[in-house]
């Protein structure tokens, strides 16, 4: 073998050996408030899945949780998320627009507009439903105290608000003035605005404040599942709610800098696998996979749902109209 051929063979051998070298990954998932349990379970499953094809790799997945809007602002301001799993597309749009850390067409990169599971908004009430709460109209009755987070910082709160608006609009015959009047009256019954959904759950469940919690469906089920929950609380399903679609995305700029693009991408893709969908369903999120959804069909109540795209023009319309400075929420809340 010539010196040249020997050198080329040595380089090829080194490249091949380098590709097989074990890697040490630390992945940061910046998520919204009530997904702690979901991703604790999913992270363990994903590490096992990854190690089947990368047995010598070390994978450490960190979680960060808080109100979705607050979390998005953190990523824009420099929190080095490899992936974001937030409450609504509008928050990831802001990361793309202001942070320039992923493309603005990020929702096209994964199935179902990058939303591997869905949820909705239900009511959690005290056991026996002492205030007789059956639907949105009951929330504005005298003496009823409602717990919901702040739409300025919480994605769940924005879903809550839009579900309430949809009810007010329907009850008012399509008149936006009547919908606005309804949500303004509703927020007069809200004594405290926590920054995130889990904070509101703690206020209601642990601190005993309020008669009804406007909750992510998964959060309401979790409250029943915890010790003694079924003896303390009931779930009330309203006549109308909203299809809550919490999306996921790789934060390209951060993942590339940390050498995590491949594993971060696979981390999100695996959410769509049978294993990922099972974990979502077991944590009370509605799975996208038809077979898994059929298996858990009895777990999830059927109800009429409005959608962000069809009924509100998408987040690019809904966010400025309702939640930006001077929007509908500011108008009705500051007027109190």
State where each predicted segment sits.
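Bacterial N-terminal signal peptides
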Residues: 7-17
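Sec/Tat signal peptide C-region and signal peptidase I cleavage site
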Residues: 18-22
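N-terminal segment of the mature folded domain
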Residues: 23-154, 333-334
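Short beta-strand->loop
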Residues: 30-32, 125-127, 145-172, 189-190, ...
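A bilobed periplasmic-binding-protein/Venus flytrap-type ligand-binding module shared by bacterial periplasmic
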Residues: 120-129, 245-262, 279-283
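Short helix-loop capping/hinge motifs at secondary-structure junctions, enriched
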Residues: 128-134, 153, 166-174, 254-262
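Ligand-binding pocket segment of bilobal, Venus flytrap-like solute-binding proteins
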Residues: 171-239
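Extracellular/periplasmic juxtamembrane helices and adjacent flexible linkers that interface
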Residues: 255-336
